[in-house]
Amino acid sequence: MVDEGDRAPDFELPGLRGSERGVYRLSDCAADGGVLLAFYPCDFSPLCKEKLCTLRDVEWFEFQPEFSVLGISQDSLYAHEEFIGRHDIPFPLLSDTDGRVTRSYDVQYDYWQRQPGLPRRAFFVLDESRTVRYRAVATEATEVPDLGPLLDAVRSLSTLDSD
């Protein structure tokens, strides 16, 4: 399990930002100013849509100028492309199709919606050195971690930078 204070496991996943495909390495994204990892089961479930659209509407850069948000699910890039187009998601959605990254963060369901290994809804706020500053993992499928503590954790990154 990856807890607060731990160094987050590095990874590299294919992803999509808008219609631009690329490969995203966590260490590269974090080095630019911290990262929010937002794990979620799938693009088109109603709760995931609500969660990702809520994240879309947050002004992340007012907290931390070079902050990155990365959405991670087991959906394909094709599903991500459709979802991004329908909901104007401005941050990259990454495809963890084999569940390797989900398992390395220990945020997978055993079974959900008759599918093994889908990601739970989870947030990890990482600083520039990939240290986990905040972690929230939903225990129930209908639970969405609270945004208030998440925003506080992101704000605290700018305090760490000024020390």
Task: Set out the residue ranges of the language-model regions.
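Chalcogenol-based redox active-site neighborhoods
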Residues: 1-163
